[in-house]
Amino acid sequence: MSRPVALVTGGGQGIGAATCKRLAQDGYDVLLTYNTSSQPAEMLVDEIRESGYDALAVKVDCANDGEVGLLGIHPWMARKIDVLILNHGAYRRVAADQMTIETLRNTMAINFEGAVGVYKAVQPHMTDNARMVVVGSQLGIRGSPHGADYSASKAALAVWARSLAQQ
């Protein structure tokens, strides 16, 4: 019998890496994405494999529809996804009154639209009992004077996730 599969976006470092390690400890094979740095992601893959589970890191810019689309046809999708963790994100500290529309659009493209895109690409390959976790932030509730764009993107994610849960 094959092991369950977890997909973690932004899994190469930080909260994502810790989540990948925990999922492997809980018996999952892990497909993780990274965007900017392959080395930490590959080191994590090696660590998970050494513990007896399978893991693979793939480069995906979640703001790039083409790369997200390729994730949706990745060979691991044939194994079916049991857990989807939408963890990727970008946070650039910019004072709220200095934020440009371009900055806002870029952050929303990565953090919000990217998460929706990954979900749409992967959803046909999720098991009937699959679970999804959307990693949020308290800044999505209370805002931030140095990250209004990030706060808005996390608020959008929270509302979107609640909307999906109501279906």
Label each PLM-derived region with a short phrase.
Residues 97, 142-148:
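Active-site loop immediately N-terminal to the catalytic Tyr-X3-Lys motif
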Residues 95-96, 100-105:
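Substrate-binding pocket helix/loop in short-chain dehydrogenase/reductase
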Residues 137:
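Residue(s) in the substrate-gating loop at a strand-loop-helix junction
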Residues 124, 166-167:
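Alpha-helical segment proximal to the catalytic Tyr-Lys
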Residues 119, 153:
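Active-site helix of classical SDR
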Residues 12-13:
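Conserved glycine-rich cofactor-binding loop
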